[in-house]
Amino acid sequence: MNQTYGRLVSRASIAATAMASALLLIKIFAWWYTGSVSILAALVDSLVDIAASLTNLLVVRYSLQPADDEHTFGHGKAESLAALAQSMFISGSALFLFLTSIQNLIKPTPMNDPGVGIGVTVIALICTIILVTFQRWVVRKTQSQAVRADMLHYQSDVMMNGAILIALGLSWYGWHRADALFALGIGIYILYSALRMGYEAVQSLLDRALPDAERQEIIDIVTSWPGVSGAHDLRTRQSGPTRFIQIHLEMEDNLPLVQAHFVADQVEQAILQRFPGSDVIIHQDPCSVVPREGRKFELV
């Protein structure tokens, strides 16, 4: 699984870096030629894209290193750090756009040949949609937080390029402040995306539990297993591609230790079959030592 995960995540990061680099060169020319503040916004965003995608590429390779004596749970948290770094990069670009947009609202500057800007923006829009489609597929296969953060960023780029097209079209017909107004709106949306991305990264670093749906699946697997009378103290978290799952099984007092161990192994394999690559720890408790009021997920 780790090899497939690493290959897909690395390809997604390389594709994002290559596309952002190519679009940056095109946008530099378009901004120089037209003077559009909206295209300047897209140019700054491409710079952030490159920095973020390169960070992802380096961090993902580090996060895939096996556990060692100093990092016994692996290096998966590096992905969350990459997502947090991305949110900082994006926030900085959003603040830059605010200042530039306000300046152009106060003193609007007519553009030279908006048609060139429109052509460049259409190319950027098509390329970004293709990249986001590929990233969404990688996220569905790997659940990589770093690629998900990158995907959210490029999804905002799709909306941004659409807004730029409208702004350039309005400017073509003489409404020069439209360029700055749309750039300001883009900056607000980019800042919102950055804050949301940073929040998710911090939650992962704080070991937030797995989603409710996944925890419910674990509970259903455990409590429906023959020989298991109930369960409690389910604890979950995720680090990179690895889910960490801990749970206590409640079993009949007279069940032999060997049989209890066998049942726990079966439950562990069932969980691993549903969530491959997970780190599962199961503890067996006799029913009599678990206070009834302290039980959770008890079978009725």
Curated annotation (Swiss-Prot):
It is found in: Cell inner membrane. Keywords: Cell inner membrane, Cell membrane, Ion transport, Iron, Iron transport, Membrane, Metal-binding, Transmembrane, Transmembrane helix, Transport, Zinc, Zinc transport. The chain crosses the membrane at residues 24-44, 82-102, 114-134, 156-176, 178-198. Zn(2+) binds at D45, D49, H153, D157. GO terms for cellular component: plasma membrane. Its main location: membrane. It comes from the Bacteria. It is a multi-pass membrane protein. InterPro entries: Cation_efflux, Cation_efflux_CTD, Cation_efflux_CTD_sf, Cation_efflux_FieF, Cation_efflux_TMD_sf, CDF_Transporter. It catalyses: Zn(2+)(in) + H(+)(out) = Zn(2+)(out) + H(+)(in); Cd(2+)(in) + H(+)(out) = Cd(2+)(out) + H(+)(in); Fe(2+)(in) + H(+)(out) = Fe(2+)(out) + H(+)(in). One of its GO terms (biological process) is intracellular zinc ion homeostasis. One of its GO terms (molecular function) is ferrous iron transmembrane transporter activity. Belongs to the cation diffusion facilitator (CDF) transporter (TC 2.A.4) family. FieF subfamily. Homodimer. PANTHER family: CATION-EFFLUX PUMP FIEF (PTHR43840:SF41), MITOCHONDRIAL METAL TRANSPORTER 1-RELATED (PTHR43840). Divalent metal cation transporter which exports Zn(2+), Cd(2+) and possibly Fe(2+). May be involved in zinc and iron detoxification by efflux. This is Cation-efflux pump FieF. The lineage of its organism: Bacteria, Pseudomonadati, Pseudomonadota, Gammaproteobacteria, Enterobacterales.
